Structures are given as C-alpha cells and as structure tokens.
Swiss-Prot record:
Belongs to the TRAFAC class TrmE-Era-EngA-EngB-Septin-like GTPase superfamily. Era GTPase family. GO terms for biological process: ribosomal small subunit assembly. Residues 42-46 are annotated as: G2. Monomer. PANTHER family: GTPASE ERA, GTPASE ERA, MITOCHONDRIAL. The keyword RNA-binding applies. GO terms for molecular function: GTP binding; GTPase activity; ribosomal small subunit binding; small ribosomal subunit rRNA binding. It comes from Pseudomonas putida (strain ATCC 700007 / DSM 6899 / JCM 31910 / BCRC 17059 / LMG 24140 / F1). GO terms for cellular component: cytosol; plasma membrane. Residues 63-66 are annotated as: G3. Residues 155-157 are annotated as: G5. This is GTPase Era. It is found in: Cytoplasm; Cell inner membrane. Residues 125-128 are annotated as: G4.
Amino acid sequence: MTDSNPTRCGYVAIVGRPNVGKSTLLNHILGQKLAITSRKPQTTRHNMLGIKTEGDVQAIYVDTPGMHKANDKALNRYMNRNASAALKDVDVVIFVVDRTKWTDEDQLVLERVQYVTGPLIIAVNKTDRMEEKAELIPHLQWLQEQLPNAEVMPISAQQGHNLEALEAQIAKHLPENDHFFPEDQITDRSSRFLAAELVREKIMRQLGAELPYQITVEIEEFKQQGHVLHIHALILVERDGQKKIIIGDKGERIKRIGSEARKDMEVLFDSKVMLNLWVKVKGGWSDDERALRSLGYGDL
C-alpha cells in the first residue's frame, strides 16, 4: 500500500526590500524567535536558514538581507550579494511587499525576481492594518500585472493572518525529497551566531534615532559551566562617538542592552546566562573586506 502523502523537502527564499517584514514572517512560521527584528532597515545582514518540519513536509526557509540601492561600502555589497544569491537553487521564492507602499527598492527586487523560473509567491504584508479590505484590491491587481506568473497572497506576518494558507501553498510546490535535516533542527546557524545577533538586535532597538549602523558583534567566549552559560561579546564600532552612545550615561544604556539580550538568550538556550559586553573601536571595519571576512561575513 502506497503512502498518499509523499515526503517533500525544499528551499524557500524570502526576499524583499529592507524593513518589510521578512524576518518577522520567518519567526511566525517557525513559531519561535530565530531571526532578529527591529524597525530599522538592514537589520538582517546574513542569509540564515529557518527549518520547519511538519509531518511529511520539511520547508527550509532562507531569510535574506533586504535588497537596497546603497552599494558604496563592502558591507552593503555583501548584503545585496547574499540576497541575490538566495534566488538561485531554491524551489520557491516569496517576495514580501507592503500592502500599499511601493519604493524604488521594491522595484529593484521586482526586477530581480521577474527572472525566477520556479514558483513565485508575492506575500502582501500588513494587510491586517487596513480597515477597508476593498482598498487592497487595486494593489493586488497591479502586482499581478507586474508578475503575471506569480501567486499573490495577502498576509500579516505580525498577526499570523493567512500564514497557514501561505504554508500550504509553499508545500504544494516543494519537490518530493527525503528530508535534509533532522526533525528537531530549526537552523543551520551556530549558537554563537545567534547570541551575537541577539546583542545586535538589542543595540538597534535601544539606540533609536541615534543608531550607528557601523556596529557588529563578535562572540569571544561561549562556554557552559555547570548550569550557567558564560558569554563574552565584543561590540565593534567605527568611532569613539559611537562607543559613547552605546555605553550611555554612566553605562546605563549598555546595561539595558545586556539585560534585554540575556533574557532572550536564556529562553533560546534554555539555560541561565552570564553575559558580559565590551565595546571596542575598529575604524573602517564596515568597508574593509579583510576585516569583514574575519568577522564572519564570508565571501565579498
């Protein structure tokens, strides 16, 4: 007797401009926080896999940096190259757009995804915020005209609206394959990477308008000792002024950053965490390809 539900497994790229809700979408699909989020553009810098196994279906989501026009620094080039590379060798592409707003960077992404030959889904995000759903129809029709071969689906990444339907549509397009990852694995990234990203998220959320984008985080120690996980994180900035901003008056800001990051780490790693933060000035790191490679930014 044959199984009527074949085993399916494949890769799903989530692409779009910065700050459109890609990482929020991934987190909601996975049912837990994996990708960092903030209201600031370019929060995501690396491609990261989020793996969801449900019964016979394993969907391997590739969360990508937002495609953007700035290409002047090595870090910007790295992020754009990562996002474009995700369109290759995947089985499904999800193009996340806003319910009403359309920018030059959305157009940039559209020009890339129009060459996708496989299944393409346009996920129109934040539709829960519209009082009159009928107002959405012209935008959906316009998107369909731009990409006639795509499926257009209204969603809310934040509230989870219509995500079950989105996942069902994705599953239909995944090829028949054995699963590539164990059922309980949710990402390809190391615990060190996830810890560094959590610190960076708290920095972005704490700094607001003062945010210096030339910030990265390096984990210097990650060691379990008994029931306590000891993490030492180095925050790199490019100027002394940025260092002062992060530390804050009498060290209050860096204390808040550390406290918020530690809380999330304890949930993620299911352990008591002792987190120590330092801030160091490394001038020009975001435009230094050798420095970026040493900090884990891969090929540039």
